[in-house]
């Protein structure tokens, strides 16, 4: 009977387990045979042998149940291994990439926010004061013309630039101010390089007079352009904007031809990327600021994206052809 338990310990599956059970507990099994032998014994010898058989039978049944449980757990473990889904496998589903405009916006924000610039969000619908008058754009200025600006009946308009956000920020906050604004702007244009809706980014820094100089503006702009375009050359040109004085425009060496001359740069070797300058005192006076100085800059996000993604047609950004967008 000791042999039965030894055989039980070597069992590895249900089939072997059933064979051992029948051999031990079946009608013609070992224990049935032992009980049949009792009829040939008398008195105390019969009782002693019966107790011994009963003891071994209980021991076998206990060992059998433990082995049965162990085999069930083993088979379950093997089944789970076979049916397991390996979540570490690479997903074969094609994932999308970031839209060029979103990529460009995020890259701009990643540069300016660590420098302390706060991201401001303004309304798309503005009034005359915030979009024009406060920015030193008088009533006769061409930008107010119906051919360039979308007007509503209640004297409201779709903002033509993100500069109104600068005015709102200066009205609502006290200097020092460091802010950037990214958002949609609207003008009545539609061709290879213009769309009725486009995106701008503008920045503004304001502090007490004497604390902000043109050299601060120059340092910020040059750091940003080198961060965004890498090792390009920069060229500063004097310019005119009603809301800044002095004003400048900044060009970068052509990222397409490396200044050898191409159609994109009109064979000049330079590409215009932004405008900037010191905030005009007329702007400060319009909102009631006194004794302040500051600088502002602005650039088109589509323009930056076109240069980094080498896109020739601005309208590609707003088309729904995934074959085009997936190429960026």
Swiss-Prot record:
Mg(2+) binds at residue 245. NCBIfam families: pheS. One of its GO terms (biological process) is phenylalanyl-tRNA aminoacylation. Its main location: cytoplasm. This is Phenylalanine--tRNA ligase alpha subunit. InterPro entries: aa-tRNA-synth_II, aa-tRNA-synth_II/BPL/LPL, Phe-tRNA-synth_IIc_asu, Phe-tRNA_ligase_II_N, Phe_tRNA_ligase_alpha1_bac, Phenylalanyl-tRNA_Synthase, tRNA-bd_arm. It comes from Helicobacter acinonychis (strain Sheeba). HAMAP family: Phe_tRNA_synth_alpha1 (MF_00281). Binds 2 magnesium ions per tetramer. Tetramer of two alpha and two beta subunits. PROSITE patterns: AA_TRNA_LIGASE_II (PS50862). PANTHER family: PHENYLALANINE--TRNA LIGASE, MITOCHONDRIAL (PTHR11538:SF41), PHENYLALANYL-TRNA SYNTHETASE (PTHR11538). It catalyses: tRNA(Phe) + L-phenylalanine + ATP = L-phenylalanyl-tRNA(Phe) + AMP + diphosphate + H(+). One of its GO terms (molecular function) is tRNA binding. Its cofactor is Mg(2+). It is found in: Cytoplasm. It comes from the Bacteria. It is an enzyme of class 6 (ligase). Belongs to the class-II aminoacyl-tRNA synthetase family. Phe-tRNA synthetase alpha subunit type 1 subfamily.
